Amino acid sequence: MPLSNAQLAQTIDHTLLAPDASDAQIRELCRQAAEHRFYSVCVNSANVPLAARELAETGVLVCAVVGFPLGAGLSAAKAFEATAAIAAGAGEIDMVINLGALKSGRADDVKADIDAVHRACGTVPLKVILETGLLTDDEKVRVCEMCRDLGVAFVKTSTGFGHGGATLADVALMRRTVGPTLGVKASGGVRDRAAALAMLEAGATRLGTSSGVAIVTDQGGGAAGY
């Protein structure tokens, strides 16, 4: 059965992660999210307080990114950022893994990094960003297995700032690896309705995009960037 606009909107994290995003742009993001009933807005942690105020009483969540976009900070810093973002009003957290540790074969350190943020989140859902464009398929599977074992809420393809974005092949691989219990978030390059529906068909359950309005109104090409 085809998804209605309302159902499609509930798969979307309406996203603005530009480092120079102004207060006015964050307010407009939130206005659009409330109007179209998106699942959440996804913003940098410094913008969480404003977004939380703008979205109070709307039912739209605020999602904050942590260790973004490089993932190369200390685990303690990532955990602190997650805790502070939640205290400021974030209802979900998207973290970037330690890619250097993964590439160096330090799988235990990668898992410990994820676990530190997961613990800091408590009951708040955690999405773990793999940055799939930089990983081999074996590395993607390894991180997905870690996330499955730790019981995080979602695995996520990309930051939208690195090399490449979400691909159908990566979404399908991630879904096969984590099974039916974890969410899969496709992000980076999902800019129109056809791409969004294809990602959902491949196994995604959430979409990170700056083109949410274009997707749900079927206006064709969406915002450049994320």
From Swiss-Prot:
- Which of the seven top EC classes does this enzyme belong to? lyase
Q: Which reaction does it catalyse?
A: 2-deoxy-D-ribose 5-phosphate = D-glyceraldehyde 3-phosphate + acetaldehyde
> What InterPro entries would the database entry show?
Aldolase_TIM, DeoC, DeoC/FbaB/LacD_aldolase, DeoC_typeI
Which Gene Ontology MF annotations are present? Answer: deoxyribose-phosphate aldolase activity
A single GO cellular-component term on record = cytoplasm
E.C. numbers: 4.1.2.4
Spell out the catalytic residues. Answer: D94 (proton donor/acceptor), K156 (schiff-base intermediate with acetaldehyde), K185 (proton donor/acceptor)
SUPFAM superfamilies from the UniProt entry: Aldolase (SSF51569)
The UniProt keywords, alphabetically, are: Cytoplasm, Lyase, Schiff base
Q: In which pathway does it act?
A: Carbohydrate degradation; 2-deoxy-D-ribose 1-phosphate degradation; D-glyceraldehyde 3-phosphate and acetaldehyde from 2-deoxy-alpha-D-ribose 1-phosphate: step 2/2
Q: Name one GO biological process term.
A: deoxyribonucleotide catabolic process
Any keyword Transmembrane helix? Answer: no
- Predominant cellular place of this UniProt entry's protein: cytoplasm
> Cellular location of this protein?
Cytoplasm
Q: Which family does it belong to?
A: Belongs to the DeoC/FbaB aldolase family. DeoC type 1 subfamily.
Function (record text): Catalyzes a reversible aldol reaction between acetaldehyde and D-glyceraldehyde 3-phosphate to generate 2-deoxy-D-ribose 5-phosphate.
Which HAMAP family does the UniProt entry name for this protein? Answer: DeoC_type1
Q: What is this protein called?
A: Deoxyribose-phosphate aldolase
Source organism of the structure: Burkholderia cenocepacia (strain HI2424)
Give the gene that encodes this protein: deoC
